[in-house]
Design a protein with these regions (language model features):
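Conserved catalytic cysteine-centered active-site region
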Residues: 117-119, 238-245, 270-281, 285-288
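C-terminal catalytic domains of large/alpha subunits in multi-subunit enzymes
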Residues: 96-97, 236-243, 271-276, 305, ...
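Conserved beta-alpha junction segments in alpha/beta enzyme cores
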Residues: 182-235, 332-335, 457-486, 491, ...
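Flexible, low-hydrophobicity surface segments
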Residues: 18-170, 271, 626
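Local cysteine-cluster metal-coordination motifs and their immediate loop/turn environment
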Residues: 2-9
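Thiamine diphosphate
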Residues: 250-273, 277-279, 500-507
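Glycine-rich loop/linker segments at domain edges
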Residues: 35, 40-47, 173-205, 294-378, ...
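Phosphate/diphosphate-binding loops
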Residues: 126, 132-134, 274-320, 543-570, ...
Length: 754
């Protein structure tokens, strides 16, 4: 437990006091675009005083808990809540019959039951929820709910699901002459395991009834407006009766995009008339959020004798698990980027997002682009080896450039795409010369013999869209006002650790001309949506709204007072003070703006169209040491060059790069959810292996800046590219060290040693 210095109390519409930590999320940012100011939430996080959703309490608060299915697929015969209600301190036990509104929810398609009523479709599916006076009692009561099941045979093989037409979406992309052929052909089958986002903070929230039939919801989220819409529908209330508030979040990476405990909390709070809090434990968290889709892929690449690609065929099957979540969009992304950042005129891609009784899968950093990168980059290495061409030169000869069509959709790439610059930058970076016992596979324990260790070097280049696609109306609203001698940015954009609280303040400071700015997160009743903190979009979209609002505000103030500059002192004219800042702050100057990215379209029947608003890419070089006798791998260093548009905050970008690379390393050599018959066998951080700081390689990062993006000051989103090709680079390096044709990630010791 972190030491709490005291309590901050606020009274909501219900009249109840919500108690949080004394030191609330942040403070003022000094420094403008291009600087790397200290994060306003950095010290509180470092000292353990940051306010997370788990820290919220309220007067008269109850605790919630969930009864979950022990079967991946079963018919519900009966539910008896009486045993739970006999436990002292239990205030409510709710089932599907108690859902007052729409019985299902879903981020893109409402198909998931709020509480299962007739059938359970995955292991851990919620069947009932309980409210009690303390957490232990709530969990005991949830375990006491007597549910009679009739187990059924689960469908767990995505390829079988595909043949049965159990799919959420199919994709078909055809571009160019389908009879085109090359001089050389390589084929391959590839598989990617199920990865967890593994945020350190589990799902948590607090719902407080307002006494008038409505509720205030404080819960972990990446998209509070869409969460609110789903809660409203299932509660059968008006939109203004549910207010979703941003909270402190201990990591997300896609795990917070889908609703989980949100509706349950509100149902319990409204039923009991008391605030209700829920916090998932780690095992529950593995069933309470979606995961990265496992994928199976077949590729066929054809090229001429000079290494120029002539045709690419691919078949991509991803397992969506029991419910839709974002499977349709992830599949589309995987297919749109199935060729990578390479020029080719003949393409055929087919894809399926299957429905099984495996755990639901959805958004995770990279959103489909990670999986296909494993396939197409292995294919590029195979072609290079067959033709005797250097792997980087093979990629350079086929690199996309601005003005080229995307090889799958035919969309013309209008914004900067420095693929060749990235490749050349990687080639120019010096290789490490490291011979340190501590870096050997097995570490300083000397479980390996240096004589057996082989060094390998591998390369990979990845590409992905920025923002939402396929005609989605992607927008964000922001409000900028003058207050307390500086700028205040109000937004519903969620800070999940990526540094948005710093960047939005930097944008406002630069646009207004003041030296201090604060970001204030507000609830759904106070501002329109900022969209999801996903798709590497917030810097561009919410940043664009902030820039537009701040620019308008500055222009209005200067026009009103006929000034020629705005500074910390106030409105200036001919270098003299015209109106003091203190006076401006009391006059309520503010401006609200809504920013949209360039319009996109859905694909036609051949998969063609202007599907994306922008693109970003990165390249990685991995250096590994491998002991092929023990199957141990040490990732020594990762070099990377990344397309960032304009670097608004270089240190923050480097932080994103290092974190994203470590997730990529995890997928390459250790991270995988093991599901047997639909049951997760490793739902904890003891058995689900994660890279620690001891596994973190040295990282050398080069930020490639180019003008031309429509983001604020030319910025691009930077969160996802570090993850897309880092996995593939590590696997390529292991192939180089061992000579093995590794086609599955994560690469396990038995894949190397046996």
């Amino acid at each position: 437990m972190h030491r709490v210095r005291g309590d901050h109390q606020s009274t909501g519409r219900s009249g109840r006091t919500v108690t949080t930590r004394t030191v609330k999320r942040p403070a003022t940012v000094e420094g403008g675009v291009g600087d790397s100011p200290t994060r306003p939430d950095g010290v509180t996080k470092l000292c353990g005083r940051f306010e997370y959703a788990q820290d919220l309490t309220a007067e008269g608060m109850l605790w919630g808990a969930t009864t979950r299915s022990p079967h991946p697929h079963a018919r519900i015969i009966s539910i008896d809540v009486a045993p739970a209600l006999t436990i002292g301190g239990v205030h409510a036990v709710l089932t599907a019959d108690d859902v007052p509104g729409r019985a299902v929810f879903g981020l893109e398609h409402a198909d998931q039951p709020v509480l299962a009523s007739e059938v359970v479709n995955y292991w851990g599916e919620p069947v009932a929820v309980v409210a009690a006076e303390d957490e232990d009692t709530a969990r005991r009561a949830a375990a006491a709910v007597a549910v009679e099941y009739e187990p059924m045979e689960p469908l767990v093989d995505p390829l079988e699901a595909d043949t049965r037409d159990e799919v959420f979406r199919r994709m078909r992309i055809r571009r160019g002459d389908q009879n085109a052929r090359g001089d050389v052909v390589v084929e391959g089958y590839y598989e990617v395991g199920m990865q967890d986002q593994a945020p350190l903070g589990t799902e948590a929230g607090l719902a407080v009834p307002d006494g008038h039939g409505g509720v205030d919801l404080y819960a972990t989220s990446q998209f509070i407006h869409v969460d609110q819409e789903q809660v409203v529908a299932s509660l059968g209330l008006r939109s203004d009766q549910v207010r979703a508030h941003p909270t402190g979040i201990g990591g997300a990476f896609g795990a917070r995009e889908d609703v989980n405990l949100h509706i349950h909390l509100c149902m319990l709070a409204l039923h009991t008339g008391q605030p209700v809090k829920m916090v998932y434990d780690r095992s529950e968290s593995f069933t309470g959020h979606v995961h990265r889709h496992p994928a199976r892929m077949w590729y066929r690449h054809e090229a001429d004798h000079h290494g120029k690609l002539k045709r690419v065929e691919a078949r991509v099957v991803i397992d969506g698990g029991a419910y839709a979540s974002t499977t349709a969009a992830v599949l589309a992304n995987a297919c749109y980027f199935a060729v990578g950042p390479y020029r080719v005129d003949s393409v055929a891609v087919d894809g399926a997002g299957t429905r099984t009784n495996n755990p639901p899968c959805g958004a995770m950093r990279g959103f489909g682009a990670v999986q296909v990168c494993v396939g197409y980059e292995a294919q590029m290495d195979k072609l290079a080896a067959m033709l005797g061409i250097d792997p980087l030169e093979m990629r350079r000869r086929n690199a996309l450039e601005t003005g080229d069509p995307l090889p799958t959709t035919g969309q013309i790439i209008e914004t900067p795409l420095p693929v060749i610059d990235v490749i050349d930058s990687l080639a120019a970076m010096p290789l490490p010369d490291i011979d340190d016992r501590a870096t050997l596979p097995g570490g300083s324990g000397l479980t390996t013999d240096r004589a057996h260790v082989r060094r390998g070097v591998g390369y990979a280049i990845g590409i992905k869209n920025l923002g939402f696609s396929e005609g989605f109306d992607d927008f964000a609203q922001a409000r900028v006002r003058l207050e307390d001698g500086g700028a205040v940015v109000e937004t519903a954009a969620i800070e999940v650790g990526q540094g948005l609280v710093t960047v939005l303040a930097q944008i406002a400071r630069t646009a207004l001309g003041v030296s201090k700015a604060t970001v204030r997160h507000v609830d759904t009743s106070q501002i329109d949506s900022a969209g999801s903190t996903s798709a590497s979009r917030q810097t561009q979209i919410s940043g664009g709204a902030t820039l537009e609002a701040a620019t308008r505000l500055r222009e209005r103030i200067l026009e009103h007072y006929e000034g020629d500059d705005l500074t910390d002192d106030g409105v200036m004219r001919d270098r003299g003070l015209l109106v003091p800042m203190a006076a401006l702050a009391t006059e309520g100057w503010e401006e609200t703006a809504t920013f949209r990215h360039p319009p996109t379209t859905g694909p036609d029947e051949e998969g063609q169209g202007t599907v994306h608003a922008d693109f970003a890419m990165a390249g990685h070089r991995a250096v590994v040491d491998v002991d092929p006798e023990l199957g141990l791998v040490s990732v020594v260093r990762i070099d990377t060059a990344q397309d960032v548009g304009r670097a608004l905050n270089p240190d923050s970008i480097r932080g994103q790069i290092e974190g994203g690379i470590l997730q990529g390393v995890g997928l390459a050599v250790m991270e995988e959810i093991i599901s047997e018959g639909g049951v997760i066998k490793n739902p904890n951080f003891t058995d689900y292996l994660l890279p620690t700081i001891l596994d973190a390689p040295d990282v050398e990062a080069l930020l490639i800046e180019q003008d031309g993006s429509w983001g604020p000051f030319g910025a691009k989103g930077v969160g996802e590219p570090p993850t897309i090709s880092s996995t593939s680079a590590v696997v390529a390096a292991i192939r180089d060290a061992t000579g093995r044709d590794l086609s599955r990630v994560p690469v396990r010791p038995q894949d190397i040693a046996l």
